[in-house]
């Protein structure tokens, strides 16, 4: 404007120029903490928004959602949970974030204004400001193989731990004890005996387990971590993971009646075999033979009436009595006698392991006299 003229046509005495500046630019979001797509955000962190210019509170809500769109909290911009200082806005949710949880933020379009009343456009989608909180939860043990209190565990079995999340080696040991508290193996988590795959840890002891022996495992509290570094609490007792190895030992013959090489055996005597553990009938025969010519006196099926089993004792009752002063031996098929776990007695297949001689029960007779009758 160069001049002003009044109603009578008079101009102002000097030419003056006036300039007006209009602010019609809305504030924009310059940055945020946490940043969009941030991970590992502290669960107690505030949310800080930094704008392109100084802002003040307007009206409306700031809304925090979980990644699945579950509403976490609606915060009135004029509440004490929102503070404004220059270009910065700090939002302090009432509760801490959940561990390892995804979130996103909505902001009403009228929530923040610049000094002349231009409003920030707001956020109304799930992608402009989203983030994931840090994992603060320790991994837990879901299952083991063998399970706690398991019996019949294969002597060559590995010990497998399955956790609630993917894990990695920390520092420390897995320890295998016998049930009498003898430490058998101390396995460092970084050794080749311990392998990690996802949520699974496999422990491979150097030596096989011993038949029918009890064991338990301990795990140091720093040995297993999740991928964020939270540690599994560990096992420090003898009961949380204990198990018993399978019976893989075949029964053995402890004694017999008659004993090997016995003489003067009663001709009507039964033959009793006593084993080192309880046994049961398998399949096959127990055979009585003469020593003189290896002829078979009787082959008796273990499931037949000539053989009875009680606990660790097998009693053989031949159909006929022994011959007076006759030598005999007993043979047992390798599948004939089993223990209660199905392990078979090795059997007897020779002429010397169990041989004996029957008593002389024949009265002498007069062959001749001198002088003759």
Regions found by a protein language model. Name each.
Residues 43-82, 110-113, 155-194, 222-228, ...:
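Short, surface-exposed alpha-helix to beta-strand junction/turn motifs within ectodomains of secreted
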Residues 1-40, 63-64, 97-99, 109-152, ...:
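Acidic, Ser/Thr/Gly/Pro-rich low-complexity segments and short DxT(G/T)-type signature motifs
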Residues 89-102, 201-214, 314-327:
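Signal that preferentially marks extracellular ectodomain short beta-strand elements
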Residues 1, 51, 101-107, 163, ...:
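Short beta-strand segments enriched for Tyr within beta-sheet-rich domains
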């Amino acid at each position: 404007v160069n001049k002003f003229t009044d109603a009578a046509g008079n101009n102002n005495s000097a030419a003056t120029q006036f300039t007006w500046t209009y602010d019609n630019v809305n504030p924009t979001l310059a940055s945020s903490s946490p940043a969009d797509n941030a991970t590992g955000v502290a669960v107690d962190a505030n949310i800080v928004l930094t704008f392109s210019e100084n802002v003040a509170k307007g009206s409306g809500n700031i809304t925090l959602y979980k990644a699945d769109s579950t509403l976490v909290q609606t915060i009135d911009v004029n509440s004490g949970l929102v503070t404004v200082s220059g270009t910065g806005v700090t939002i302090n949710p009432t509760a801490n974030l959940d561990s390892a949880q995804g979130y996103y933020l909505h902001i009403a379009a009228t929530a923040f204004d610049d000094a002349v009343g231009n409003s920030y456009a707001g956020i109304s989608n799930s992608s402009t400001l989203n983030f994931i909180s840090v994992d603060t939860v320790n991994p837990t043990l879901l299952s083991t193989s063998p399970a706690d209190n398991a019996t019949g565990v294969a002597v060559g079995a590995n010990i497998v731990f399955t956790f609630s999340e993917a894990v990695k080696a920390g520092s420390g040991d897995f320890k295998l004890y016998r049930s009498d508290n003898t430490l058998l193996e101390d396995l460092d988590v970084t050794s080749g005996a311990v392998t990690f795959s996802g949520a699974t840890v496999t422990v491979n002891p150097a030596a096989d387990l011993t038949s029918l022996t009890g064991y338990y495992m301990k795990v140091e509290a720093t040995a297993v971590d999740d991928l964020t570094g939270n540690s599994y609490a560990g096992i420090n007792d003898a009961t949380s993971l204990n198990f018993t190895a399978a019976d893989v030992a075949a029964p053995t013959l402890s004694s017999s009646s008659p004993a090997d090489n016995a003489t003067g055996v009663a001709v009507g005597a039964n033959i009793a075999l006593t084993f080192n553990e309880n046994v049961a009938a398998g399949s096959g025969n127990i055979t009585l033979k003469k020593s003189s010519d290896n002829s078979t006196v009787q082959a008796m099926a273990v499931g037949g009436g000539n053989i009875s089993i009680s606990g660790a004792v097998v009693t053989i009752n031949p159909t006929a009595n022994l011959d007076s002063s006759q030598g005999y031996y007993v043979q047992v098929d390798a599948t004939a006698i089993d223990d209660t776990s199905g392990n078979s007695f090795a059997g007897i297949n020779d002429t010397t392991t169990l041989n004996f001689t029957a008593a002389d029960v024949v009265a002498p007779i007069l062959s001749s006299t001198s002088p003759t009758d």
